[in-house]
From Swiss-Prot:
One of its GO terms (molecular function) is iron ion binding. One of its GO terms (cellular component) is cytoplasm. Pathway: Amino-acid degradation; L-phenylalanine degradation; acetoacetate and fumarate from L-phenylalanine: step 4/6. Coiled coil: none annotated. This is Homogentisate 1,2-dioxygenase. Belongs to the homogentisate dioxygenase family. Its EC number is 1.13.11.5. It comes from Burkholderia multivorans (strain ATCC 17616 / 249). HAMAP family: Homogentis_dioxygen. It catalyses: homogentisate + O2 = 4-maleylacetoacetate + H(+). It comes from the Bacteria.
Length: 444
């Protein structure tokens, strides 16, 4: 049996965020009433995949039991991966991470490769903080690829991968089932889960936030109430699907920012059944229930929070994943675009589609920007002038857009690649230089 990644999946999904799921590709493959029977059905092996400590509080504990044809331990020893090593996982000062400038930074899109390049080969680290070895912080990668992975499988031991496609669909076959993901959707692949990526549209480009720390979860809603923002039912987890395929395959592992490879004589996507709450999932950003002001002022961007990774300090997150989707603006006598801002947190932004309402030009789909701790940022001169003169007695719909932000509590440090690449816009600062002085002490 082989998983067919040449066409869209036909199986449905399991609905809900971090639910206790149970799914089997063969009837009766899940053991009844126990996790590790003396003999599992169909001659399968029982294997637990733990995403948190055994003793983590029940509400935060993540693990799944897999029933597979061969255990994950069956492969040859790892050796260094011979391909390009453009990944960084430790963001202390080094040759890969030079001193971080306080400048506002912006990049054009990562160009499509000129040679055949798959998802793994197309990864490059732009920025990050903390350390994968310390299981703290994150790495922000871009990917640009034009070839499906061929008999190659990948996993990251460093963190969970929040994937934001910008161009091209991704058919992602994982150990626990298949996710078909398109632009305007996101996928999250847990730490350690093995997968392969097919590119049905040829070229593919996007963003990844690799979370080294506490697992992503839905935010509390506070006074919003019991509904709103990203609703749990809209998160989709794959049903069990497996392949029983033998041959010469390659398993690529990411550990402490380095890529390693091992020969493996079978497809590792051989999980026939599984149950638990540690599994990949996807979410359609177009289903986000946007909250906003219906009186005056522009609320803080925390109202656009989709997922976050928490810290031990209440209200202070290690990572916030925020989106700026289509929405109505109705606030009267209010400057409606995002305001001028300096932030104790650091903000890495990307654009999936359209235009961002705080930047008239220069910030394009596939591009990125970085505004670090206390770096002044906000609307450009043209946006400010137009918004200051607009008629706010009438609602206005911000349409044809999907921007997002990875916001972190600690400094986001750009890599040497990010600071030296030709995609860096050296003239980004000029978008604010045309802002005129309006101050007149004689006229209020």
């Amino acid at each position: 049996m082989t998983l067919d990644l040449s066409k869209p999946a036909t199986a449905g999904y399991l609905s809900g965020f971090a639910n206790e799921f149970a799914t089997e590709a063969l009837p009766g493959a899940l053991p009844h009433g126990r996790n590790s029977p003396q003999r599992a059905p169909y001659g399968l092996y029982a294997e637990q995949l733990s995403g948190t400590a055994f003793t983590a509080p029940r509400g935060h504990n993540r693990r799944s039991w897999l029933y597979r044809i061969r255990p994950a331990a069956v492969h040859r020893p790892f050796e260094p991966f011979a391909g390009a090593q453009r990944l960084v996982s430790d963001f202390a000062d080094s040759a890969d991470v030079p001193p971080t400038p306080p400048n506002q930074l912006r990049w054009n899109p990562l160009p499509m490769p000129s040679e055949p390049t798959d998802f793994v080969e197309g990864l490059v680290t732009m920025a990050g903080n903390g350390s994968a070895a310390a299981m703290s912080g994150c790495a922000i990668h871009l990917y640009a690829a034009n070839r499906s992975m061929r008999d190659r499988f990948f996993y990251s031991a460093d963190g969970e991968l929040l994937i934001v496609p910008q161009q091209g669909r991704l058919f992602i076959a994982t150990e626990l089932g298949r996710l078909d993901v398109e632009p305007f959707e996101i996928a999250v692949i847990p730490r350690g889960v093995r997968f392969t990526v097919a590119l049905p549209d040829g070229d593919a480009r996007g963003y990844i936030c690799e979370n080294f720390g506490a697992l992503l979860r839905l935010p509390d809603l506070g006074p919003i109430g019991s509904n709103g923002l990203a609703n749990p039912r809209d998160f989709l987890t794959p049903q069990a699907a497996y392949e029983d395929r033998e041959g010469a395959f390659e398993l690529v592992a990411k550990l402490n920012g380095r890529l390693w490879r091992a020969d493996i004589g079978h497809s590792p996507l051989d999980v026939v059944a599984w149950h638990g709450n540690y599994a990949p999932y996807k979410y359609d950003l177009r289903l986000f229930n946007t909250i906003g002001s219906i009186s005056f002022d522009h609320p803080d961007p925390s109202i656009f929070l989709v997922l976050h990774s928490q810290t031990d300090t209440p209200g202070v997150d290690a990572i916030d994943f925020v989106i700026f989707p289509p929405r109505w603006l109705a606030a009267e006598d209010t400057f409606r675009p995002p305001w001028f801002h300096r932030n104790v947190a650091s903000e890495f932004m990307g654009l999936v589609h359209g235009a961002y309402d705080a930047k008239a030009e220069g910030f394009v789909p596939g591009g990125a920007s970085l505004h670090n701790c206390m770096s002044g940022h906000g609307p450009d001169a043209d946006t400010f002038e137009k918004a200051s003169a607009s008629d706010t007695t009438k609602p206005h719909k911000v349409d044809n857009t999907m921007a997002f932000m990875f916001e972190t509590r600690t400094l986001i440090r750009p890599t040497r690649y990010a600071l030296d690449t030709a995609q860096l816009q050296a003239n980004y600062f000029e978008c604010w230089q045309g802002i005129r002085k309006h101050f007149n002490p004689e006229q209020r």
